[in-house]
From Swiss-Prot:
GO MF entry, a single one: DNA binding
GO biological process, one term: DNA repair
Name used for this protein in its record: Recombination protein RecR
Claim: DNA repair is one of the keywords in the record: yes
Source organism of the structure: Christiangramia forsetii (strain DSM 17595 / CGMCC 1.15422 / KT0803)
Keyword Zinc-finger carried by entry: yes
Domain Toprim: 81-176
C-alpha cells in the first residue's frame, strides 16, 4: 500500500497493530478520524492515554478496575463465598449481562497453553488457591471456554484443590465446544450458570 504522507502511513501502521484490523480497515478508520473535529480526536487520544496510565487490576479478583477493588468486589450485596473463574474481563462482562449471577469472580488472565508458552505461573492461579486454603471460598464455578486449553486449565486448578472441602462446579454445556464465552448469547449463558453441574460429572461426559 503506497501512501502520499508519512504521517498517514505511520497512523495506519499503528492502527493495524490492533487485533482484527488489517491495513485497509486501518486506513478507513484513520481517514474517518481525519474528517472529525480536532477536539474529538484529542478526546479519543486522551481517553486511551488515561486508560493506559491509570487502569488497575482489582486486588481481590484481578478484574480491570479504576480503584483498588472493582465495583463487583466492593458491592456488599454480592456473595463473596461463590467465585466464578474466568479467562478475562470480556467473560466477566458477558456473565454480568445475563443478570443471573450474584457471586464474585476470579480473572485468570488467560488459559494454560503450552503451545503459546503460557503455563500456570503466568496466570493468577496461585492467589485463587490461596483464597481457597484460607477458607474464604465455598464454591468455585469454572466458566472457561469449551476449548482444549480451557479444559486443561479447569483440570489443573481442580487437581490443585484436592484435599480441600471446596465445592467445584462448571457451567452446563449449553456453550458449544470450541466457543469462547463472550460469544454466547445471554439466555444460553445465563442458563449454563444456573444449571451448572459438579465438575467431577463434567469429566465423565
Amino acid at each position: 500500500m503506497d501512501f502520499s504522507s508519512k504521517l498517514l502511513e505511520q497512523a495506519v501502521d499503528e492502527m493495524s497493530q490492533l487485533p482484527g484490523i488489517g491495513k485497509r480497515t486501518a486506513l478507513r478508520l484513520v481517514l474517518h478520524l481525519l474528517k472529525q473535529p480536532e477536539e474529538q480526536t484529542t478526546q479519543l487520544s486522551k481517553a486511551l492515554l488515561e486508560l493506559r496510565q491509570n487502569i488497575k487490576l482489582c486486588n481481590n479478583c484481578y478484574n480491570i478496575s479504576d480503584t483498588e477493588l472493582c465495583e463487583i468486589c466492593a458491592n456488599p450485596s454480592r456473595v463473596s463465598e461463590i467465585v466464578c473463574v474466568v479467562e478475562d474481563i470480556r467473560d466477566v462482562m458477558a456473565i454480568e449481562n445475563t443478570g443471573q449471577y450474584r457471586g464474585h469472580y476470579h480473572v485468570l488472565g488467560g488459559k494454560i497453553s503450552p503451545m503459546d508458552g503460557i503455563g500456570p505461573s503466568q496466570l493468577t492461579i496461585k492467589p485463587l488457591i490461596e483464597k481457597v486454603q484460607a477458607g474464604k471460598i465455598d464454591e468455585i464455578i469454572f466458566a472457561l471456554s469449551s476449548t482444549l486449553e480451557g479444559d486443561t486449565t479447569n483440570f489443573y486448578i481442580f487437581k490443585q484443590l484436592e484435599g480441600t472441602a471446596i465445592k467445584t462446579s462448571t457451567i452446563a454445556r449449553g456453550i458449544s465446544v470450541g466457543d469462547e464465552l463472550e460469544y454466547a448469547d445471554e439466555v444460553t449463558l445465563g442458563r449454563s450458570i444456573t444449571n451448572r453441574i459438579p465438575f467431577e460429572n463434567s469429566m465423565k461426559s
